[in-house]
Design a protein with these regions (language model features):
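Primarily marks folded extracellular/lumenal domains of secretory and cell-surface proteins
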Residues: 148, 154-463
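Beta-strand/loop motifs with alternating small/hydrophobic and polar/acidic residues, enriched
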Residues: 2-170, 444-463
Length: 463
């Protein structure tokens, strides 16, 4: 009789279980390795991007230093002079992150900024396969690798007056025979004896707004020899008789906007007006007879530099000699036969804090250029009414003021210069002639970035 011994399935089950665990373990290890690799890649990408924000912080640090100290006092605020003629600062931003910044004090200044961010851990590092990041206590016993990025930034000053008309908000050019063009009072090819000459005009009479609204710029039937610009998604409306373009387009009667003469990328800063340093002298109203005309105010300056004066109110007839800077704090009104007369060679810079100002009457009698008269509105100056029939030669910078133009002149020289305001509302006859010399000789904004180039972050010799 043959006895059958049953197989021992327990051993087979154990082997099968071990093999299964091994396969699952290998799969899990492969998955964890893949997850770790992806995590490290993601963390490195985030660190790489973060390093650029640290670089930007360094650039802002440098621009702020230049804003307050120019390029002649860069040793202020704990900046260190290093050879050859450079200024350096290191700024810690926490968690092992920091930036190093160097300024080269030339005109315009050049900035080098480097950003340093702790690198994420690699899979070979303790717990790196799972964490993918820097361990809190790693710095105590090992040097943490850093991700470094570095840029060279070129700068330049941006002029206040770059357009015939510039506004933060809406521009509405209603009226009759409204037009813009440009000339250059410092280039004899584009002026006659320094004055506007329609036979020598140019087509840079640009009109622009930061507004992003529909109908941000209503050109109406204006003849704009230049370009029109709005903020992102803003629109320009041109009436049936309106024309925007170069001289060939506008002067030949073409209607609408010439291709290439409209864009929607306008985004400029409007810095506040800063008063001159020092204590202003006082101004006394009275009756002053000069050349057979009685004046209410006589403002006498010096030839060397502006004399800083102050008055709570200004109006009537004003006579200006020399270079004068005048603060008008409460009331500014010129109507009827009122005027501001600039003697030959005189300059006047008005700092107007009056909430509502009127510049009408016979306007500003300025035999010089637009560089000789500036109206600067403080943040309390929220309205400026411009009218009368006198020609205006000068520049208006009132970034908080709603600019209302009523009436208009009786010839082609209504407004020579440039305007920068909050909004523009036009009614009447006005021709704007932008003096391009204002862009070169007029006031300048702070330095702005013009070029941004990423470099190898191991030396400062790219300056």
């Amino acid at each position: 009789m043959r006895i059958t011994i049953p197989p021992k399935n327990q051993g087979n089950a154990l082997v099968f279980t071990l093999l299964t665990v091994l396969v699952i373990g290998m799969a899990l290890a492969s998955y964890l390795a893949l997850a770790s690799s992806q995590n490290v890649t993601t963390m490195r990408s985030l660190a790489w991007t973060h390093a650029l924000t640290v670089v930007e912080a360094g650039v802002e640090e440098a621009l702020t230093q230049i804003h307050y100290n120019g390029i002649t006092n860069l040793a202020a605020n704990s900046w260190n002079y290093i050879s050859p003629g450079l200024y350096y600062k290191k700024r810690s931003l926490g968690n092992g992150t920091y930036c190093e910044v160097v300024i080269k004090p030339v005109e315009p200044p050049v900035i080098l900024s480097s950003g340093f961010v702790p690198a994420p851990m690699t899979p070979s590092t303790q717990l790196g396969m799972i964490l993918g990041g820097v361990l809190p206590g790693a710095a105590a016993d090992q040097e943490i690798a850093l991700i470094k990025r570095k840029v060279r930034v070129n700068t330049k000053r941006s002029p206040w007056y770059t357009k015939a008309m510039l506004a933060k908000g809406q521009i509405d050019l209603k009226g009759f025979n409204v037009g813009t063009d440009s000339f250059d009072s410092l280039d004899p090819l584009y002026n006659t004896l320094g004055k506007y000459d329609p036979a020598k005009n140019k087509a840079n009479g640009d009109v622009a707004t930061n507004s992003e609204l529909v109908d941000s710029l209503n050109a109406g039937n204006a003849k704009i020899r230049g370009k029109v610009s709005t903020g992102p998604e803003g629109t320009v409306d041109v009436g049936p008789g309106g024309s925007v373009g170069d001289k060939g387009w506008v002067d030949t009667g073409s209607r609408g906007i010439q291709p290439g003469h409209v864009d929607d990328d306008m985004n400029v800063d409007f810095p506040e007006v800063v008063l001159p340093e020092g204590t202003p002298g006082s101004v006394t109203a009275g009756t002053y007879s000069i050349g057979g005309t009685n004046y209410n105010y006589v403002l006498s300056g010096s030839a060397a530099g502006p004399r800083y004066l102050q008055t709570p109110s200004l109006g009537g007839k004003v006579y200006v000699t020399g270079n004068v800077a005048l603060l008008v704090s409460a009331s500014f009104s010129f109507t009827g036969n009122d005027c501001i007369y600039l003697a030959p060679g005189a300059t006047l810079t008005l700092y107007v804090g009056a909430p509502s100002a009127t510049l009408g009457g016979n306007g500003v009698i300025n035999s010089g250029s637009a560089l000789d008269f500036q109206y600067l509105g403080l943040n309390t100056n929220t309205k400026l009414a411009f009218g009368g029939n006198g020609a205006f030669v000068g520049a208006i910078y009132a970034p908080y003021a709603d600019f209302q133009l009523n009436g208009g002149g009786n010839n082609i020289t209504d407004f020579i210069g440039a305007s920068v305001t909050s909004t523009v509302q036009m009614n009447g006859h006005f021709n704007f002639h932008y003096d391009e010399a204002l862009g070169r000789r007029g006031p300048q904004r702070d330095y702005v970035v013009t070029a941004w180039n990423e470099l190898v972050p191991d030396s400062w010799d790219e300056l």
